[in-house]
Amino acid sequence: GHFPKDKSDLSNEACRTRLSDKPEGEIPETMFHHLRRNGYYTVGIGKISHYVDGCLYDYEAPKTDKPELPYSWDEMLFDAGKWGNGWNAFFGYADGSNRQSHKKQVKPYECADVADEGYPDGLTANLAVKKIKELTTKNEPFCLAVGFFKPHLPFTSPKKYWDMYEESSIPISPMP
């Protein structure tokens, strides 16, 4: 590993400012890059690090295909579903709306009566199941990294999961 050389190395922008647009030998090697370089087939699905779908773009900017972790992945997969792109899915609600469509005035949680695929993490889980079934049929080592959005605001999931807990039995933290 490497120690941070600059305070910018500690921010969420480190991948954008320190890794992207640089030749392979000039950047720190990620674990996934190391595995890939040593014969593993590497697949990333979902939110592996800061950016929601593995590509560098801001919430209100057009989507790009510029990788957040260059040289790390043989495949980087994400299903944005009805939300259209990663950031909209990250802040998405079951009806397909998102933080942007609500002018950033959003409720902190939602529990719609929908299937798992009614929220982005269900789509991510489906991709992961499909991909691991495919990878296990090949005769090569692989690394499958899967990142889910939750827990993160907004706290959204299908109602069946909320119904597993009695709200009154959950203690409220004394620290707000």
Where in this protein do the model-derived segments appear?
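Formylglycine-dependent sulfatase
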Residues: G1-P176
